[in-house]
Amino acid sequence: MRIILLGPPGAGKGTQSERIVERYRVPQLSTGDMLRAAVAAETPVGLEAKAIMESGGLVSDAIVVGIVADRIEEADAKNGFILDGFPRTVEQAKALDAMLAQKGIALDAVVEFVVDETALVGRIAKRAEETAARGQPVRKDDTPEVFKTRLDAYRKQTAPLSDYYAGTGLLRKIDGMKPIDVVTGDVTALLEGFRETASS
């Protein structure tokens, strides 16, 4: 079970990812977590990343792909993994494809959560209101203004991945506007279909 999750911020990827991890016992690979772990473990790629970050630079796609390559070799990822938050660009997707091909690993699917952006902004605004009403501080990225900026960035940078993966035949779309449990049911049905195909 090797899958990539796509979708704009607020689409519910995090929630669905947690449920996939729980059901299928495969790790969710977050590039941020992997980067920190590689730096802490002082792996060759981690040391390279550390030097770049300490000088204020951005870690290159090659380094991130190297970190993903190391991580998927670990025992808990042998039966599969979920990539969430990577790749973010078509260039990263191509680099990831090349690395996986080198290892003889194939992705099972790229699952895109399709959502209504206007409704998403409304959902975020409501969440911010409810948080404030409880007297709790509202996260900076939970305000409609910041959220719209994040959506714009997603649209420009990451949305082209949908076309890229559609071209590979891996893309599967899920309606992310349905209730959470219904979305989970749709994701499970999709993934069970892949498991049956793999075992037949």
Curated annotation (Swiss-Prot):
InterPro entries according to UniProt: Adenyl_kin_sub, Adenylat/UMP-CMP_kin, Adenylat_kinase_CS, P-loop_NTPase
Annotated GO MF terms: adenylate kinase activity; ATP binding
This protein's record includes keyword Lipid metabolism: no
Annotated segments matching region LID: 126-142
One GO-annotated biological process of the protein: AMP salvage
Record note on quaternary structure: Monomer.
Comment on protein domains: Consists of three domains, a large central CORE domain and two small peripheral domains, NMPbind and LID, which undergo movements during catalysis. The LID domain closes over the site of phosphoryl transfer upon ATP binding. Assembling and dissambling the active center during each catalytic cycle provides an effective means to prevent ATP hydrolysis.
Name this protein carries in UniProt: Adenylate kinase
Native organism: Methylorubrum extorquens (strain CM4 / NCIMB 13688)
Gene this protein is translated from: adk
